[in-house]
């Protein structure tokens, strides 16, 4: 792959992958041919920063988890929020404990959402490479058959 396409891939992956993932991805791209660029741009990478913003503004309702694609965990956030609100009407001490636990999970989830989106993006990239290698093998086998 030529250096212009590698630079373009590097720009696309800039904030989408961790540093180690980006280095590994660029090393793997060096062996590919330039014809994959149109299909590479079709990969729907999610932004970890957008996930953090969703979590910051709608995190109490599972916004960051829904953005990441963890629907069940987003639903659990909604259920937990409702339970914390119900605890508020019964007992103040129970509410304080439930709210403290909810805030701790909410805070830890900032890190987990950010790293999880980067990991999901890397997995999408690996699946893309696997598909590209498979389709190249199929083409070469079809060419050999003729």
Task: List the predicted regions and their residue ranges.
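Transmembrane helix recognition focused on a "late"/terminal membrane span
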Residues: 1-55, 77-146
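Select subsegments of transmembrane alpha-helices in polytopic membrane proteins
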Residues: 72-75
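Juxtamembrane helix-break-helix junctions at the cytosolic face
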Residues: 63-70, 88-90
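A short amphipathic helical element positioned immediately N-terminal to and/or at the very start
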Residues: 53-67
């Amino acid at each position: 792959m030529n250096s212009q396409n590698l630079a373009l891939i590097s720009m696309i992956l800039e904030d989408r992958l961790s540093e180690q993932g980006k280095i590994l991805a660029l090393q793997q791209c060096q062996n590919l041919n330039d014809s994959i660029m149109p299909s590479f741009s079709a990969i729907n990478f999610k932004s970890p920063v957008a996930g953090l913003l969703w979590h910051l503004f709608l995190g109490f309702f599972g916004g960051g988890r829904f953005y990441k694609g963890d629907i069940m965990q987003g639903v659990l956030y909604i259920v937990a929020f409702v339970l914390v609100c119900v605890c508020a009407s019964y007992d103040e001490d129970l509410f304080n404990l439930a709210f403290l636990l909810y805030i701790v999970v909410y805070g830890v989830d900032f890190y987990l959402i950010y790293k999880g989106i980067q990991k999901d993006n890397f997995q999408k990239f690996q699946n893309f490479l696997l598909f590209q290698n498979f389709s190249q093998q199929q083409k070469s086998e079809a060419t050999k058959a003729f």
